[in-house]
Regions:
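Short acidic-hydrophobic, aromatic-tinged amphipathic segments that line or gate anion-handling sites
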Residues: 47-50, 130-132, 165
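A conserved helix-loop-beta module that forms one wall/lid of the active-site cleft
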Residues: 93-161
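Short amphipathic alpha-helices within nucleic acid-binding modules
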Residues: 171
Length: 177
């Protein structure tokens, strides 16, 4: 099996551990936008690629898949999951399995508010969650929510932007920009 790890970054140990489970003749190919990404250099082959939001990115990845006879592709960063999921058919047309959730599931997982609603609808307890500033402030006015609160962007990963805030002005300043 030949597998392509997109956005390989610093995941050297992950690639090394993955290699331990592979058979002789199997290959790891890594791609990243930075030549400084250490995981590139533990792969059997590596490629420098554009940013995932570059219009040529997907065609670049598909080209690598064809050239390296890739059997499966996955990503090591959250924002790219949706891109692979939404383009699953293009990969399947060239015989490449996408190791990522389907597009609907990827969208659900990347949107914290939608995930909270989904979990609540299925009886899975979650912290109280508001999807926007206005509804959160209405909950404060109704006495359903009190400061301090924990806020984080509705989408994103790596806890970027997650923080404890003590007042409405901070919530507004932090999350309405």
């Amino acid at each position: 099996m030949n597998i392509l790890f997109c956005s390989a970054g610093r995941r050297v140990e992950l690639l090394k551990d993955f290699r331990k489970s592979m058979d002789d003749g199997d290959r790891i190919v890594a791609a990243d936008l930075s030549e400084l990404a250490p995981a590139l250099y533990v792969a059997d082959a590596h490629y420098l690629v554009p940013r995932i939001d570059d219009p040529s990115y997907l065609d670049t990845i598909l080209s690598i898949c064809r050239k390296e006879k890739i059997d499966a592709v996955t990503t090591l960063i959250d924002p790219e999951i949706a891109l692979l999921a939404q383009n699953r058919e293009r990969f399947e047309q060239i015989g490449v399995e996408v190791l990522a959730p389907y597009a609907e599931t990827a969208e659900l997982c990347f949107d914290k508010f939608k995930m909270s609603q989904f979990l609540a609808a299925h009886g899975i307890p979650t912290p109280d969650t508001w999807g926007d500033y206005a509804s959160a402030m209405a909950a404060v006015a109704a006495g359903e929510l009190a400061f301090p609160v924990f806020v984080k962007p509705r989408t994103g990963s790596g806890s970027v932007g997650a923080r404890k805030v003590h007042d409405a002005d901070t919530v507004s300043y932090t999350h309405l920009r």
